[in-house]
Amino acid sequence: MRIIGLARHLMAAIVAGLSAAAAATDPAVIHANRVGSHPYTEGFIGKGDDRIHYVLTGEGPTVILVHGFPSFWYVWFDQMEAFGACRRMIAIDAPGAGLSGRPARDGDYRVARLARQLDRTIAALAPGEKVTLVGHDWGGALAWSYAQWKPQQLDRLAVFSAPPYDLFLEMLADDPAQRAASAYVPRLQALNRESIERLKAPSTLFETAYGRAIKEGVLTAKEGELFRDALSNPAAMDAGIAWYRANIPPFDAISLRSGWPRRAGSITMPVLLIEGSEDKTFAPTLAKRARAKAENLTTAMLQGVGHWTPFEDPQAANALLGAFLGLPGGRCPGS
């Protein structure tokens, strides 16, 4: 079995066209290797604007992790540590973030295009394998859409703090509570590269997203530096906002044709949706309405946790994810 696994990894490397000499050295990968319990490696798939940077640890069935905004691959470090002993954990920098490519056109961030890019990424990293897909925030919305589009490629789906993309648009169209929660979206969409730089918006965004977690010791000072560095580039912030500009129409203009994939049915694979009780990003009806999108849905609420469900209470989050993965006691054997 080990020989088969090594052959699969070699094939994935060949398909991805990896070059160790060409790979950048990510400070977050260096840090992960200093403090983590497993070796972490990085690589790239594709070139130019289509390049995807990924970080890998562990062996076993493949789990692909996709972060949201504003973030980068390291938001999944606690999950990679928890399950790297029995799963092949691969976290990607989403398009526009971290060391991945950064297309200049808003249209390049449409969910349909991102899903096709994710499909190529999965095919390169885990050829012939049905994977577990995990997403948070925009990465979660993308993961939902991918599962609706290509359910045959996935073994199961786990989502942290995110609705299906089509459901999010439905909620914006008909739920006043969701419109109120998303009132920030038009202001965010109005920002451009010039205003982002003039307003020093990356610094404000970092403090809003991660300042409290650092002050309370949820993230270490070093981890705070890594997130600050990852978010400091105005171009990266502009690319993150492009996800909003490309995929969220004016609320009153949302129609049945706005979502993707079109006419998506209810998926049948096992799905886990984890929310935080203090997260104000989505209306309280999210979990109930998500049941119309997934026949085999498990929902969980992390008490006292806000939007950053992967790391605010990693022990609770990992227990839920581990049980969902079918691990005895919710953890890797021997851990």
Q: What residue spans do the PLM features occupy?
A:
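Bacterial N-terminal signal peptides that target proteins for export
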Residues: 1-11
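Bacterial N-terminal signal peptides
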Residues: 9-19
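Flexible "cap/lid" subdomain of the alpha/beta-hydrolase fold that forms the substrate-access gate
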Residues: 25-40, 50-52, 62, 86, ...
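Mature N-terminal segment immediately following signal peptide/propeptide cleavage
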Residues: 43-49, 53-57
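Conserved HGGG/HGGXW glycine-rich cap/lid loop of the alpha/beta-hydrolase fold
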Residues: 56-99
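Active-site helix-initiating loop/hinge in glycosyltransferases
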Residues: 68, 110, 312-313
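Active-site pre-Tyr helix/loop in NAD(P)-dependent dehydrogenases
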Residues: 69, 163, 308
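Catalytic histidine-centered segment of alpha/beta-hydrolase-like enzymes
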Residues: 305-314, 318
